[in-house]
Structures are given as C-alpha cells and as structure tokens.
A protein has these predicted regions:
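Active-site cores that bind ATP or allylic diphosphates and position pyrophosphate for catalysis
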Residues: 1-77, 82-88, 96
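Catalytic adenosine-cofactor/nucleotide-binding cores of aminoacyl-tRNA synthetases and other
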Residues: 56, 68-199
C-alpha cells in the first residue's frame, strides 16, 4: 500500500505485515474505519488532515477506498501537538470545540492558529477562511511536535475581534448596540462576552 503523504512524503506499508482491520463490533455497531471512508466518499472530501498516530489507519482506509472504487483523498499526517507542560490531554474535552466556544474563542482564531501551527510562518489574525486556506502549503509543516499555546490562541482571538466588522457580530451583540458603539468597544475586548462590561 503506497501513497505520498503531504507532510511525511512517500509512505509504504506491506499488507502482509498488517493485521486485518476490525470494522464491526460483536454487537453490530460499526467502528470508525469504514464509516469514515464512506463519509469521505459521500461528502467529496479531497484532503484528510490528521495526527501522525493515524498513519496505519490510512493504509487500511486506502484499501477501503480502492475496494469501493472511489478516488483516494490526499492525506497529511501532522506531528502531534504538545502543550506547555508536554503532551496534550484529551481528558474532559478540555480541547474540544465546545470548550473553546464556552471560553469565547472565535472559530477563526482556532482556524488561524491551526493553519500555521507546526510551520515557521507567523499566525495572522484573519476574519475569513478562504484567503488563509489558499496559502496553506503542507510542505511547510515540520515533523517535530508543535506546541499548542492557549495564551497565543487568546491573543489571536482578541486581534481578530479588534478587526471584525459590525455586520459579522451584530446578531451576537447586546440589543441596541450599533456600529459606532461596536467600533468604540472592539479594541478593548479579548472575547465577545467582554462587551457586557462596556455596554
């Protein structure tokens, strides 16, 4: 099984050395591998970006794409992220989207950080994903673990809010807050919930 990974380069797995994948539990419920491949086909996924701990899964899933007669998406396996104290923990969903949302992190702040994490390129506070996506080059991602810094994420979040247009946040602002008020308040906040202290 061969493919060219967008981060790791040419990959080769000998199927004779791989165990048969388990795709269904004894109770009839499906495990991740086959449903994920089917979803990718159904949704027209062209690129799969995930952690390097899934490289072996990719070899298995590529066989599934081939068996289903589907085009293979491109794969990029990035180095695993570390935190300020070493390995990141998934415990209690501390790094899940819901947790970031509850902390007032704007989706674009997370997208901006993740698009550059593991590269030498600076993280830019952007308010639209399309220009950022157009500049992603997987050849710039290193193989060494990248450090996820929540303080850096908070700073990017603030910078994004400082340049966010009124129209983009109007529905989320307190009733009666107009464009002039938003323009006066936005340089002073680090998350949208901070508006309440000014209005």
């Amino acid at each position: 099984i061969e493919w060219t990974d967008l981060v790791r380069g040419d990959q080769y797995f000998d199927p004779k050395l791989m165990s048969d994948p388990v795709i269904r539990r004894a109770d009839g419920s499906w495990l991740y591998m086959l449903p994920s491949a089917i979803d990718d086909i159904d949704m027209g996924v062209t690129h799969v970006v995930r952690g390097e701990d899934h490289v072996t899964n990719t070899a298995t899933q590529l066989q599934m794409f081939d068996a289903l007669g589907a085009a293979r998406p491109q794969f990029a396996h990035e180095a695993l992220l570390t935190g300020s104290e070493g390995k990141l923990s998934k415990r209690l969903g501390a790094l899940g989207m819901d947790a970031f949302r509850e902390r007032g992190i704007e989706p674009m702040a997370l997208i901006a950080l993740l698009a550059r994490l593991g590269t030498s390129e600076p993280v830019e506070p952007v308010t639209q994903a399309a220009p950022l996506i157009a500049t992603i080059d997987f050849a710039h991602f290193g193989r060494a673990p990248a450090r996820f810094d929540e303080e850096e994420l908070a700073q990017i979040n603030a910078k994004i809010l400082h340049q966010t247009d009124y129209a983009a946040v109007a529905a989320r602002l307190p009733e009666g807050m107009d464009e002039a008020a938003w323009g006066a308040i936005r340089p002073n906040i680090s998350k949208l919930a901070d508006v309440a202290g000014w209005w």
